[in-house]
Amino acid sequence: MESTFIMIKPDGVQRGLIGEIISRFEKKGFYLKALKLVNVERSFAEKHYADLASKPFFQGLVDYIISGPVVAMVWEGKSVVTTGRKIIGATNPLASEPGTIRGDFAVDIGRNVIHGSDSIESANKEIALWFPEGPADWQSSQHPWIYEK
């Protein structure tokens, strides 16, 4: 099974969207493998977004991520990286389809509620950064009702 990293950003936490977001991933049939509520340090946020360090919006993004707690999660499932990105919606909420998290809950690209890994490689890197202890090793009893063998 594939894994992905999902982070509910400070605006999503402050607006009380944690349960709604978790519910959407669970209803799709994905498994929550790790979760923590974290106040992110500046140096950690800079490390997480290191690939964007040369972008003009980098410092604003870092300031946003450290402005309040985030919910960091690992989700597992078939094609969870690609499907997770579809559940989340486009980076710019105004380009996101209704029914996606950003399409339903965000209007500004600078307050777009959620982060999701954009590739398997990014997911592996982000999971290792945020969860060095690794995710929980368990399987839902619903597994055979969601996935064929």
Swiss-Prot record:
SMART domains according to UniProt: NDK (SM00562)
This enzyme's EC code(s): 2.7.4.6
Disulfide cysteine pairs (residue numbers): none
Gene Ontology MF terms in the entry: ATP binding; DNA binding; nucleoside diphosphate kinase activity
GO biological process: CTP biosynthetic process; GTP biosynthetic process; nucleoside triphosphate biosynthetic process; protein hexamerization; UTP biosynthetic process
Keywords linked to the UniProt accession: ATP-binding, DNA-binding, Kinase, Nucleotide-binding, Nucleus, Transcription, Transcription regulation, Transferase
Active-site residues per Swiss-Prot or TrEMBL entry: H115 (pros-phosphohistidine intermediate)
CC cofactor: Mg(2+)
Record's catalysed reaction(s): a 2'-deoxyribonucleoside 5'-diphosphate + ATP = a 2'-deoxyribonucleoside 5'-triphosphate + ADP; a ribonucleoside 5'-diphosphate + ATP = a ribonucleoside 5'-triphosphate + ADP
Subunit structure: Homohexamer. Can also form dodecamers.
Family listed: Belongs to the NDK family.
Function: Major role in the synthesis of nucleoside triphosphates other than ATP. The ATP gamma phosphate is transferred to the NDP beta phosphate via a ping-pong mechanism, using a phosphorylated active-site intermediate. Involved in transcription regulation. Has G-quadruplex (G4) DNA-binding activity, which is independent of its nucleotide-binding and kinase activity. Binds folded G4 with low nanomolar affinity and corresponding unfolded G-rich DNA more weakly. Stabilizes folded G4s regardless of whether they are prefolded or not.
UniProt protein name: Nucleoside diphosphate kinase 1
Organism: Zea mays (Maize)
Gene that encodes the chain: ndpk1
